[in-house]
Swiss-Prot record:
Annotated protein name in UniProt: 2-phosphoglycerate kinase
Catalytic activity: (2R)-2-phosphoglycerate + ATP = (2R)-2,3-bisphosphoglycerate + ADP + H(+)
Pfam families associated with the record: ATP-cone (PF03477)
Protein source organism: Methanococcus vannielii (strain ATCC 35089 / DSM 1224 / JCM 13029 / OCM 148 / SB)
Keyword annotations from UniProtKB, A to Z: ATP-binding, Kinase, Nucleotide-binding, Transferase
Enzyme Commission (EC) number: 2.7.2.16
Enzyme type, top EC level: transferase
Span of domain ATP-cone: 8-95
Family (UniProt): Belongs to the 2-phosphoglycerate kinase family.
Cited function: Catalyzes the phosphorylation of 2-phosphoglycerate to 2,3-diphosphoglycerate. Involved in the biosynthesis of cyclic 2,3-bisphosphoglycerate, a thermoprotectant.
Length: 313
């Protein structure tokens, strides 16, 4: 028996693979394009029913997208249809690199995974993971700041006197020295993704405009976003919530909160100096929507740069 006979699923075919049709994936794509979640699910369910009624067991990804596009047009969702079409065109022709930066606790990982889900980008990499890899290749004696957290790296700095030690300037210098070797790994992933034509989202506190290589700021398909939290109360609540679902020590964050706040202000300052969007991440849904608007604007520019395509997809 074939896979589709065993699973009783409609298979969606791409060039290199086949996967079962998913209402959930289609719903997320439609929601990302601006459709209400409930309406997105209804349309996804209707499309699945139409395919089943027609007795289709396999459908190409291009044909499925074509059907979704015209289903939106027929329901007077022209703007959503064009946005849905735009994203598919751009993601098919270009590798897209999205960098989501921000201090500890502002929610970069949550937003990164939400964006990946909405845009259909399969890879999300946290910069903490890159830091761990860099630790294996750079000795502690050479760069001791790398072996500290972003907010305790200053303790590994050499200092001439105690008076010069525990200051904002030293906190930020330690943070910069902590970030610099991690950026080597981040930039390597960006370069390789661009070379291999793969889309990826990187997230974490090590993504700092101004420290990141200047060439990436001018690349159309590298999109840099910065998240922040101006409210100390909300920021601290995020650490409390994180501690409930992970083994990260709450007291360590709270006891270093003033330094984390300094780092947050520093990253925001560097972002504004380098014309990187700064987004208040109070509401996850609103933040995701703002990020998608920024990404869509960049997609429009990329699409205009591409050669005219006679096909819909």
């Amino acid at each position: 028996m074939t896979f589709e006979e065993i699973t009783n699923k409609i298979l969606v075919k791409d060039k290199d693979y086949e996967m079962p049709f998913s209402k959930g994936l289609l719903t997320r794509s439609l929601t990302a394009a601006g459709m209400k979640p409930s309406e997105s699910y209804i349309l996804a369910r209707e499309i699945e029913r139409d395919l089943t009624d027609q007795g289709l067991r396999k459908i190409s990804k291009d044909e499925l997208r074509r059907r979704v596009y015209y289903a939106l047009i027929n329901r007077d969702y022209e703007d959503i249809a064009e946005k849905y079409l735009l994203w598919r065109r751009v993601l098919k022709k270009h590798s897209i690199i999205i960098l989501v930066g921000g201090a500890s606790g502002v929610g970069t990982s949550t937003i990164a995974f939400e964006l990946a889900s909405r845009l259909g980008i399969p890879s999300v990499i946290g910069t903490d993971s890159i830091r761990e890899v860099m630790r294996r290749s750079i000795s502690k004696d050479l760069v001791p700041m790398l072996y500290e957290s972003s907010y305790t790296a200053w303790k590994a700095l050499r200092h001439s006197s105690a008076e010069e030690y525990d200051t904002k300037e030293m906190h930020l210098l330690g943070f910069e020295r902590h970030v610099e070797p991690v950026l080597i790994g981040i930039e390597s992933i960006i370069d390789r993704s661009l070379t291999e034509g793969m889309s990826v989202i990187l997230e974490g506190t090590h993504i700092v405009p101004g420290l990141l290589g200047e060439k990436y700021h001018s690349m159309q398909n590298v999109i840099i976003l910065n998240l922040t939290l101006s409210s100390e109360e909300i920021h601290k609540q995020r650490f409390v919530a994180r501690a409930k679902v992970s083994d990260r020590p709450l007291e360590r964050y709270l006891s270093n909160f003033e330094i984390i706040k300094e780092i947050n202000e520093y990253i925001v300052k560097k972002s504004r100096e380098n014309k990187v969007p700064v987004i208040e991440n109070v509401s996850i849904s609103e933040t995701v929507q703002k990020c998608l608007e920024i990404v869509t604007d960049r997609f429009v520019d990329l699409n205009e740069e591409s050669e005219a395509d006679s096909e819909i997809y």
